[in-house]
Amino acid sequence: MSIELTNLFDEFDRGRLSRRQLLQALGIAVALRPAAAFAQGQCGGARAGTPECDPTPAKLPFEPTGWNTVLLDHFSCQVADYPKEAAYYAALMNWKIRSDDGKQAVLDIGDWGGLVLRGGFQAPPPPPASDAPPAGGRGGGPRAPRNAAFDGFCWGIDAWDAKKVETALRTRGLTPVADNHGDFQSFHVKDPDGFDLQISNGNRKNRRQGPATGQTTAPAPFETTSWKTVWLDHISFEVSNYKETAAFYHALLGWKLGTDEGSQNQCEIGDIGDIIIRRGGGGNRSAAPSARPPARRAAMGHISFGIAGFEPDAVKGELTRRGLTAREDTGGRGDIHTASYKSYHTTTPNGFDLQISATTKANRWA
């Protein structure tokens, strides 16, 4: 789904947009975009093949490292109220809290990934008000900002050798910053948009060993589900130049490039999951030629996690029973009971768009 439409539904889910306003805004959006815009990508229908939707991939920024990504070590997320967010993920997604030191909580995503939640998030000022109903995109009306931002991710690579990794990064024009503690070894670098990329020695044998028995100060917001998170369905990664970013991660971390749709590229992160690297982090496309280009930026618009035994009515019922929204998303492929792609979006206490899907390693290409 395009960023503008995702934001519209996000406002509706949070109660900041009435049903009438949503329908009015959707009428505007549909007039501006083909129906295919409701699915992932912006270059379907009549826009396919236009200059704005050129599917030619970018050249690689440097010689490939030959590394393979073998682990989602952890996501890094800053929120306004981290104990509340941690308690929510623990109850809804059944992620175990490994630790909470009063400044951040570390959670296990199933037995294959991690999440570090930090406090201290300061929301940016809202955009100027407008008489039009909130459109959720450039030039739209007032929209309260999220109180959460995923601002980094850490990936474990195979055949770790700290000196060789540092040399490989420097010879490719990157500036690695070591971040080590105990058996944990890593380097931070910046991607083309300045996003914090951490590369580590993490693998399934040296991470998340032993039971996670931590607690956070916030109470559980509702009864815990029995869901098991088994797959990283996709990260929606909105960047300034998706072609450059896709080429960067392909060359550096070995992520397999998908078909360039003209506005995004869905890449495979080994046997961990997928990432949709998409247009949306700037670019100043509508500005005058003389205008100063904006600072490049990247953001995770949403993250979709696959759970075991996904059954549409049961999942929706669990969300509704807990007072949570459940916005259906089949990627434009029809009824959720028969579509090949099945998922629901909901919103975390700090306002992040969490997607829960039926996608697993076994059906990732369905």
Regions found by a protein language model. Give the residues of each.
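N-terminal beta-strand motif that seeds the catalytic metal site of vicinal oxygen chelate
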Residues: 6-14, 44-83, 113, 150-157, ...
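N-terminal secretory signal peptides
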Residues: 1-17, 21, 28-30, 41-42
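Core segments of cupin and vicinal oxygen chelate
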Residues: 16, 25-31, 77-124, 179, ...
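Vicinal oxygen chelate
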Residues: 3-9, 79-86, 91, 146-193, ...
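Conserved short beta-strand elements that form part of the metal-binding/catalytic scaffold
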Residues: 43-62, 96-148, 159, 196-204, ...
